[in-house]
Amino acid sequence: MRPAGRSANQVRPVTLTRNYTKHAEGSVLVEFGDTKVLCTASIEEGVPRFLKGQGQGWITAEYGMLPRATHTRNAREAAKGKQGGRTMEIQRLIARALRAAVDLKTLGEFTITLDCDVIQADGGTRTASISGACVALADALNKLVANGKLKTNPMKGMVAAVSVGIVNGEALCDLEYVEDSAAETDMNVVMTEDGRIIEVQGTAEGEPFSHEELLTLLALARGGIESIVATQKAALEN
């Protein structure tokens, strides 16, 4: 029995609260069970130097956790004077995932920064960040079109992510912290709304996993992502 009584293929309750803050062009509070992340999308005119003159835009991301997002307080990375390796890995993942959702040529010379700040962590913070940031990005792009700065919306479709893993020999979807910490295999999967894979991060923490188990985990992830995408689309219609 899973901690919340979920079935093996069931994601936690997902809530996406749009327009959560007033200044950013897109803002979403995303909740995957007890994991809560504030995602904002900020638009700036211009692109990084390596893209100047190429007529395309750029999407980048930053990720962080509030000091008491976890069971015990973690010092702010700003106080330490540098970002940790985990933080850099996650924010690069978020940026790669969301660039797959957008036609950068159609975006033109705009940069959109996605800031994902974890308020409360209970497993799956990077996958929640991607899923919430995609909705914030959609709102920001809609504003560019509504304001006449873009003629065509460059959004190609939704992108979402979910964690999957093997816990006590059973393949599970959307691991919460107690499951994640006990997992023999832990995997994060990012997909487009039509089920194409953007990224798979998978590690055998204990016993190596088989090819058949990998396919089972990917199938679980696809089902979970389909559910998350349906929630994203419903949120954008409200």
Curated annotation (Swiss-Prot):
Gene3D superfamilies: GHMP Kinase, N-terminal domain (3.30.230.70). PROSITE patterns: RIBONUCLEASE_PH. One of its GO terms (biological process) is rRNA processing. Phosphate binds at R86, G124, T125, R126. Disulfide bonds: none annotated. Belongs to the RNase PH family. This is Ribonuclease PH. It comes from Citrobacter koseri (strain ATCC BAA-895 / CDC 4225-83 / SGSC4696). The lineage of its organism: Bacteria, Pseudomonadati, Pseudomonadota, Gammaproteobacteria, Enterobacterales.
